Amino acid sequence: MNNFFQYQDDKEYKYKILVYPNITYMKDLEKDSYVVVLRNVIKELNKVRDDIHWTILSPKHVMSLQFENTEQLMIDMPSYPNKMRTHFNADEILKVIDWRNSDYDVVYSHLPEQTLALKNLFHNSTNISPKIIGYSHWFEVKENSNYESTMLAQNLLGVLEMDECGVNSIWLKEFIIKKSKELFSDKQVKQLEEIIQPHYLGIDDVSPNHKYEPKTILFNHRDNDYTGYGWFVEQMDELYKTRQDFKVFTTLTNLDRPYAERVKLSSRKEYLNFVRKMHMGVGCFKTYSAWSISTTDGLSQGVPYVLPNKLCYPEMVGKDYPLLYNEKDFLTTIESMLDNPNAREEANTYLAPLLPDFKWSGRVLSWFDNWKQLDDLKVIQDTDGYQRILKFINRRKSVTKKEILEHLGWGVRVGWSSYRNRLRTEPTIKLTKNRYEVINK
């Protein structure tokens, strides 16, 4: 299924990016963190430039990834827990990307575990040599996974094939570099230190100062071990023994307790409208945490979160944030919030000057060296072969990649990307989604 929008073949797209997905929430892709990140990357880049076309590999069509400059190509892909990290169907991918007819200048991989295979597939089975960049949403380590075997080594091998790989925080970068020392040489660890860079995730907008329901506590995370869900329930059970004037709301799991209620919300708008009514949110992450989008969702709506004073959270909200806790002080902090209205106001007053910098618009555009990675693509010298391509385009005025290759008699063994990169620099040639055209003056 391709994009709903009808393409105009004469629209100039200097760069074509192929996105390799990371699917962990198949039952509702709109809520998958990968989709949330990619949607905001495309949206923010579209505000400042119109020369990128995105081809997104996906197991299902995702409405929120539907833009004028995107297309979605369907591939079979398993999902969580980690089958998607082990699955790679080279024949299907080759068929779908249609390399004889299509161009890809950059591969934006959101699944590092498959990036080494993906790079080899391009370099050895097509005539395309794209730049590889990426984002790692998750690293399988003992601190967050109870699998007998994990894919951490495979993940890092994929990262080593990238020019740059984003992670959600400096804390996570340092955590993974420490883990990598158990697996790789000093030279490879140094490479990882250069490749892995913090790409802070964002919020849609800042909308504080809403009326809230007093003494409500929001747990809007998954019920996994790494989120501290079991420990949180134990703490709430203890609190309920001494007071029954609070209520816990969950959004992703059912909690069978007299003090708890699950809410099921059908859209992001409905979700945020609910979140902003909460007195407080909580984060109970123990030994590992991604940059919690569920936490920043709440902060953006004026809901302060009680957060662990470790992992990425001092980096997220600052070391002086008044609701950072050590485990022994968790219930004391919760009760202070329940009983002292000023505690909520103090936390929001602290956050107010920080939140504008949380917006996606201020974060995405700084990634990949302000996206200058797109400008650093290998260009062929002015060869006889290049001149033949240039003359063919000028004579025909508008041609496809396949027509050029057939004219030259070139197949998979003649690299194409460096020729395309030189064509991009020609003042009289423009690159469109599927064609190379002479600019009419």
Per-range role (PLM):
Residues 304-307:
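Short hydrophobic beta-strand element within catalytic cores of glycosyltransferases
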Residues 153, 158-193:
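A short, active-site helix/loop in glycosyltransferases that binds the activated sugar's phosphate group
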Residues 109-115:
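Short His-centered aromatic/hydrophobic patch
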Residues 30, 37, 204-206, 213-257:
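Conserved catalytic-core segment of nucleotide-activated headgroup transferases in glycan assembly
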Residues 106-108, 121-145, 159, 164-166:
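Active-site proximal beta-strand in glycosyltransferases
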Residues 33-36, 341-381:
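A charged, aromatic-enriched C-terminal amphipathic alpha-helix characteristic of glycosyltransferases
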Residues 1-63, 237-241:
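N-terminal subdomain of nucleotide-sugar transferases
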